[in-house]
Amino acid sequence: MGTVTRGTTGPDRLRRVERWLAGTQARRLRAAADPLVVDLGYGARPVTVTDLQRWLRRVRPDVRVVGLEVSPERVAAARAALAGVPGAPVFAVGGFELAVPGGGDPVLVRAFNVLRQYDEGEVAAAWELLRSRLAPGGLLVEGTCDELGRRSTWVALEAGGPVSLTLSVRLGGLPQPSAVAERLPKALIHRNVPGEGVHDLLRAADDAWARAAPEGTFGARQRWLATCRALRRDWPVLDGPARWRLGELTVAWGAVAPRARGRAVRHDPAHGAGNRAGGRAGSGG
C-alpha cells in the first residue's frame, strides 16, 4: 500500500532526524522488547537505511532495521548492494501497512519525503494506519527535508496521535526561521497562511530572530538560542538549549495543528515525544 516516490536520496541527507531519534527518543529504543525500526520509503538507494542503523546502534547495538519500499526493483537493488555485508539492514517490499519479514511491531518508524507527493486529505489516513502498527510506546516520525538535509521538519506521532513538530536547520547562512516553510510536512505546508498556528509560529520566530540580531555578533548559533528563548515565553516549546544548539526547535503539536471550523485539531498526551528532559539528554553529535 503506497505510491512509489521520486527516490531522491543521498548520504547523511536525513542526519538531522537521525540525530534527534538517537538522542531524544533513545529511551523508547532502550526499553523495547524487540528493537525493530522501519525506514519507510527510503528511495532509490539504501544509504539512508544504513545511516539510520549506524545512528541507532549507538543506542541499541542489537537494533533491527528494516527498509521498506513499494518498488520491488529498489528492494532488489538494495539487497544486491549490501549482499555479504555482515549485520546489514533487511529490505522488503512494503508500504503503510508495515509488513516486515518475520513479523513484529516497530518501536520507531521513519517516513521521510514520502507523504509530500500525496494530497493533504490523504495524510490523516496514512498517519492512522502507520500509528496502528506501532509497538506499545512506539513513535512515528513523518517529515521532509531539502536535497542536502540542511533544512528539515517532522511531526512526531504516538499511538494516540501527533504530539510535536520539530524544525531543524543549518544555522550558517539561515536568513530567517521561516525559510524552512517550504519543507514543512504535508499536513502543514498548505497551512502556512494567516489564521493557522504554523503561520503564527513562523512569524513569531522571524520576529524573535530579528530582535536577536545583536546576538549574531557572536554567531548564528547564539542568535538562534536567543530566538528560542524568546519563543519559549509564549509558545509550548518542548526542548531546551542542548537541542537548540543543534539548530532544532520542537513545539507541542496543539500549537500548530491545522484548524478546522475555527478550532485546532489537537492531541494533548500526558507525555509528549519532545519532553524537555528527553530533549536535554539528547545527542550533541
At which residue positions do the language-model features occur?
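A conserved mid-domain beta-alpha-beta active-site/ligand-binding segment of alpha/beta enzyme cores
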Residues: 149-226
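A short SAM/SAH-binding and catalytic strip from SAM-dependent methyltransferases
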Residues: 106-124
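Class I SAM-dependent methyltransferase Rossmann-like catalytic core
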Residues: 1-35, 39, 44-46
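Conserved Class I S-adenosyl-L-methionine
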Residues: 198-274
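A short acidic, Gly/Pro-enriched loop at the edge of an enzyme's catalytic core
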Residues: 97-109
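Conserved beta-strand signature within the Rossmann-like core of class I S-adenosyl-L-methionine
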Residues: 134-148
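A short glycine-rich, Lys/Arg-flanked "PGG" loop and its adjoining helix->strand segment in the class I
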Residues: 124-136
